[in-house]
Amino acid sequence: MSGKSRVLRRILLLALAVYLICSVAAVQVMNAALFGRADEPKELTVRYEDVAADYPRQTVTFSSGSAQLTGWLYPAEDAAALVVIAHGLGADAETYLPETMHFVDEGYSVLTYDATGTGASGGSGTRGLAQSALDLDAALTRAEQEDLPILLFGHSWGGYAAAAVLGGSHDVTASVCAAGFDTPLGLMRQTARRWCGPVAELGVPFLWLDQQLRFGAAADVSGAKAAAASGVPVLVLHGSDDGTIPADGPSLLAACQKENAPNIRTVLLPGETHTSLLHDAQGRCSEAVFAQIDAFYAAALADGAG
């Protein structure tokens, strides 16, 4: 081997080593930044102690993998169904008190919970994007004890979960998925590109491998494909001005539009952001959006009863 060949080989090996080290380090930094513990958000539009007298609840616990999750059951008299709410990443169950109260007022019992690594639940961190579906699956096992038709409501991280779990064994009457993403890897890839630019594509194989090691087959679940294959009525909502999960990017809405399944209805909400599509800064639920959700749930329950 000539001197030039040896030098070239060393340069290539060094470049490969740098690539491997930087890619692995970048994935670890990303995980640490995104998936640490998520304790109570600093800013809540409504706090439970302010509404406890009007919305009594009981605390429930159940396991999701090795984590013990804490949830709350809000019973409604002569409830027509049980709404299970899956929250977003960095939020917790109490973040969605406006939605919880709305559903109770509409005559539904509601089950909320803090996901793994969040709020009152166990876990050293939230683990990753696929964890939301695993936690919702565990919550549904607890929800089935109430012996009521089950309706799902998920936002963002929970919006993905409310679609992804439809590929499982639980009997779900209908699901509303707001501002969700289609696949964990798709959103991780977009986030990496946002942070690092096009060079982030070099690290995608390591993102994929990390997800496989953490979650196995659960990392590959497409919310859109699971929803389409289930036949369950699904309402997918997304804001046109969502900067967190762009509607025309790795969103559940875009993927569901490609699936074009008859059981899925997609609604793009003009001018709405990642959170404003549900409630405003004062905690008031969007009347127009929740009128659609209420009608959707009522129709699904009527069809199920027929």
List each language-model region with its residue ranges.
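An N-terminal hydrophobic leader/cap segment in hydrolases
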Residues: 8-63, 72
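The serine-hydrolase catalytic nucleophile loop
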Residues: 89-102, 115, 248
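Conserved alpha/beta-hydrolase
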Residues: 103-122
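Alpha/beta-hydrolase active-site loop
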Residues: 126-146
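Hydrolase active-site cap/lid region
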Residues: 164-216
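Short beta-strand/loop motif that positions the catalytic acidic residue
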Residues: 230, 236-238, 242
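Short alpha-helix in the alpha/beta-hydrolase fold that links the catalytic acid
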Residues: 232, 246-256
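C-terminal catalytic histidine-bearing segment of alpha/beta-hydrolase fold enzymes
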Residues: 259-306
